[in-house]
Amino acid sequence: LVGWNYRGHDGRWPQIFPVEPELGGEEGLRSLIETAKKLDYSIVCHTNSTDTYSVADCWDPEDVVHLRDGSLSVNDCGWSGGRMYHLCAEPALRQAQELLPQVAKLGFTGLHYIDVISTIPPRACYSDKHPMTARQTAETWREIMRLSRSLFGGFSSEGGYDFAVPELDFGLYVSFGLKPCPLADECVPLWQLVYHGYVLSNPYTTTVNPSASDLLKVVEYGGRPTFYYDSRFVTQDETHKNWMGEEDFHCATEADR
């Protein structure tokens, strides 16, 4: 469940609460979770432990990854919260320890989804207050993953970087695409050969909401069939695309359902 947090999808991370009032607030969310469980569906939600916005009520520039020159590390992608900064793993763990138990108390159970944490490289931080090597960042992120497993029953995220695999139950996609290389005769699915049967996954982004040809690739690569509602949310231009393809699903109206 994406966008349930305050101000919706990527609106205020790492701030989560209050539950977005325009969607019914906490009362509406608890009702949704209860209804899903009565229908025998497992329902989990989307949180974030790697990004931070200055509009968040918990914003503190000291929590941001510091570069060698002391400046703050900025993420090139801006979402609905505006300019996004990279959150250092040490304060991220502290915040997760405070917030994720509150999220679990709402009633979510299953493979809790933390955005992008398994599909981005661990970053070094040069802050005087919380210096971290990239290796320490990976170890700290795994602590957050283990916390998710203990609270919700499992952990999932967006990708399948090796450092995350010991704690990863499901990666939404292994890579962004399967693009042919003119220097290669064939593509060998090495990741799947190594981790198949250990981590559930999809081959690449467009095998989520797959077309007929992509669905064959899901089968070939031993993927987990996955369908993502309202995945085409990007205002497209030459540099911004809907990375999960052009297939989409909706359930807002009776006709959609």
Protein language model regions, located:
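Aromatic-lined carbohydrate-binding/catalytic grooves of carbohydrate-active enzymes
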Residues: L1-Q97, K105-Y113, S118-H130
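Active-site-proximal substrate-binding groove within the catalytic cores of carbohydrate-active enzymes
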Residues: D69, L87-H112, I117-R257
